[in-house]
């Protein structure tokens, strides 16, 4: 029984995690209250933390792809927890701010730093994404949303 419990806890913490969607930033794809399964191995197993005791790294690392729906740790203290957005731009991409997608007309932003991604919600009403938070560091990425459980 103890071995089974340890196996389940290890599987849950290392391979998959279930989150509940709060808000409508990815409507109509994800609705408030949906339970989503996040694959923590999608981009490699995350080890350590940039601000932690052990140095950050990824085992079997893979890059986030444009269009992936990604779960990531919030980069600001005022918004604790895990956020979910779609990856819109990759490291090195220039993002045009204004018109139909982003925030300030006539301005640009660059995900120039290595391992930074531009994340956007699908809902124009939601601003809890890179338009407010800025590019998201790869070290904050938890994993890729692989399915809606219920």
Regions from the PLM with identified roles:
Residues 1-150:
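Extended hydrophobic leader/signal-anchor segments used for secretion and membrane insertion
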